[in-house]
């Protein structure tokens, strides 16, 4: 394993430097994409773009819903990406506006915003262009904090083309925010270390109301072609992971869209709140005073040491032992928790409007289940890494990795409850057709599954998925048969974010 260094985002003058590993015909397709972007940019805005930026989607191989709890995850970048073409107006040009267009103009109408980094994002009126404004606000805030003068706000013309399926669990939103932020850096002629951009873009996405943990942005920015990555946090750090020979990851969309920003209060952000409450309750049960736990404990990783100490006194090192002892399996009411922590829940989360939205929507809180998932999933990530580093044969290694993926899915489904009927059906079809392991990937509640498949059966495996999962959806008109390649595909680990002057 090699550590990914904190060098700046690379700047390339040829597409081959970024996409070359994909081979001739795919490189030609990429060239057509960029040519189309240039042509459309000229048509829409009357000028050519100054520069391009791209950032890929990702598939998380293992480590779901634990990044925001401070634990490491193991994703890889995929070939599908978001490309931003951008042009900066001269100071004299008016009006001072940020105009954001999309190559898919039928689905995404042009959005126009004031050229004002201080503007608020209207979360009640969800627009696709908000993701660019997340990057816009974050870039200006970060430049200011670094003492970098980017001048008075000027107008910007922006054209977007994304091939990461939306609502797929493959981080289309992170690819959009990362490419937006990097495009802004490029057009203002500044560059920052990758790890700083990964942290910045994670914070950017919070402008849209999603309490992101940072994995999606970190792998999108820091990925290296041919390698998955172990992503650590606080500080963000990436270690290249070489996967065993003979296996391929197949990504398949359940066709249930996961609208993370729209359903945050009942799904994604709800789990963030439940984990925080579980960590505070555990801290108190394990000896902390309530006021100390409330001020110091933010994530389950903050109380892992106390949990392990308790487990150690009983001859174990597993923090789940403390969870089983001190958290009840039945859901907690707000009143139950307030009695333990001696504080009103609204006061605990008073600084987070998205968390307050969760409290308004929640009827109860499943602390035992959420903490059990986080601690067991964190152990699986390191078991995955240790397996890759072991002296097992490739065959044994692939089998072990598949078992870990299956265990992960069970935990996501039963303990974290972030699956859905379509994902359950898809995962079963994958396993029935020879996948060594299959699990939901991404936030869940829709989106994609990832399956570890022996290389020599990949074509037949994909064909079987088409027949046994997708054909009925094609017959019902859910998707077009000609678009099937967008929804199920094999992927090798791809390269990360880049600036392109082509």
Explain the meaning of each model-derived region.
Residues 191-238, 438-441, 490-495:
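Alpha/beta catalytic cores of group-transfer enzymes, especially the acyltransferase/condensing modules
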Residues 116, 136-137, 141-164:
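Glycine- and acidic-rich phosphate- and metal-coordinating loops
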Residues 77-80, 170-190, 453-454:
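DPxDG-like acidic metal-binding loop motif
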Residues 1-58, 62, 70, 83, ...:
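C-terminal nucleotide
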Residues 99-101, 149-161, 192-203, 400-404, ...:
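Beta-strand segments within the central parallel beta-sheet cores of soluble alpha/beta enzyme folds
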Residues 142-154, 184-200, 455-468, 472-477:
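Phosphate-handling active-site elements
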Residues 54-69, 161-180, 430, 434-452:
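Glycine/serine-rich anion-binding loops at beta->alpha junctions
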